[in-house]
Structure formats: structure tokens, C-alpha cells
């Protein structure tokens, strides 16, 4: 399939929205619950970035130059950070430290990538938005660390809502554009 970038973007949206829904409705999460939820979010986001890299590698019409492998790089960092969070984060401050560092580094990387390609590539603006939201979520988690796991997950979950909705809109737009470009977006012609 020529135009298949919508699938990894949709995967990221689903991961973010599932995480957001759980964090909103789980009223008193324990530290163990919090670390596993954050691990799910980080690993899921990383897998979607690696999936995006696989799809980008198949497309000859996408030229990101030397920046071509950046989604894979921050995807691997997300996955490793999520695994480390699940295994090591046995206190609130350690959970916040790990998640804030991972989200901060990946968010800055995604923001820079988005700024570089915001006019040239359809995902450029989405990368910029996701990068900014992720960096602010990392900073917010640091600010509410003393308030406990619910507050930390609340900040990350709030960011996940923004990420999920924006990525869902982006995925649907990419899907629509892909179908229009392939000529399959139209239904059967009606004869009067």
C-alpha cells in the first residue's frame, strides 16, 4: 500500500486514548498500578513510533534526509524507558524521574523533528504538537510529584487526551488523503 502512514498514527492515538481513559476513571491507583500504566503508555507510544519508521522506510516518496531514522530512535527510547519504568520504579519520585526524563527527551526530539518538517511533510505539524505536549507533560509530572500517583497519572493522562485526539484526527486525515490519492475514496457512481 502506497499511502499507509495512517496506521501507526492511529495506533498511537488508540494507545494514548486507552491510557487516558484508564487514568481518568481509576480513582485511587497504587504505585504499582501507576508504574504499569506508565509503562504501557511509554511502550505503546514507542511501538507506534517504530511502526511509523517501518512504514516510512517503505515509502520512496518521503525524503526526511538525515532525519529519516529519528522516529525509530525515540521509539526505541520510549520502549526501553517503559520497560525500565515497569521494572525499576518502586517509588513515586523514581517513577516521575524515569517518565519525565524519557518523555522530555522524546518530546524534544519529536518537537525538533516536527519543526524541521512542518511545511514539507504532513506529519510535521503533528510531531510539533505531540512534542510540545509531551515536554509539558514531563514538566507537569515533576511539579506534582509530591501529590502522589493519582496526580502524576492525571498530568500524563491529560496530555494523553490531547495526544490521542490530535493523532486520531491526523490518522483519519491521512487515511482520507490516502484513499483520495489512490482513487478508492469514492463509492460507486450513481446513475440517474
Residue ranges and their predicted role:
Residues 62-77, 98, 122-130:
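Cytoplasmic-side transmembrane-helix entry/capping segments in multi-pass membrane proteins
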Residues 1-63, 146-149, 172-192:
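N-terminal topogenic module of multi-pass integral membrane proteins
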Residues 11-16, 38-51, 69-83, 101, ...:
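Core segments of alpha-helical transmembrane spans in multipass integral membrane proteins
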Amino acid at each position: 500500500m502506497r499511502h499507509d502512514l495512517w496506521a501507526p498514527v492511529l495506533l498511537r492515538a488508540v494507545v494514548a486514548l486507552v491510557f487516558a481513559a484508564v487514568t481518568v476513571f481509576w480513582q485511587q491507583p497504587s504505585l504499582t498500578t501507576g508504574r504499569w500504566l506508565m509503562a504501557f503508555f511509554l511502550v505503546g507510544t514507542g511501538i507506534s513510533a517504530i511502526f511509523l519508521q517501518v512504514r516510512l522506510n517503505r515509502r520512496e516518496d518521503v525524503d526526511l534526509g538525515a532525519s529519516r531514522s529519528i522516529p525509530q530512535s525515540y521509539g526505541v527510547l520510549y520502549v526501553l524507558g517503559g520497560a525500565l519504568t515497569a521494572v525499576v520504579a518502586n517509588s513515586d519520585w523514581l517513577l516521575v524521574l524515569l517518565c519525565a526524563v524519557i518523555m522530555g527527551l522524546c518530546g524534544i526530539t519529536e518537537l525538533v523533528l516536527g519543526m524541521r518538517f512542518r511545511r514539507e511533510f504532513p506529519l510535521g505539524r503533528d510531531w510539533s504538537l505531540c512534542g510540545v505536549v509531551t515536554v509539558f507533560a514531563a514538566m507537569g509530572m515533576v511539579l506534582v510529584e509530591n501529590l502522589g500517583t493519582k496526580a502524576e497519572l492525571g498530568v500524563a493522562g491529560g496530555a494523553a487526551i490531547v495526544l490521542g485526539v490530535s493523532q486520531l484526527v491526523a490518522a483519519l486525515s491521512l487515511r482520507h488523503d490516502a484513499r483520495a490519492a489512490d482513487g478508492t475514496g469514492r463509492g460507486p457512481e450513481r446513475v440517474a
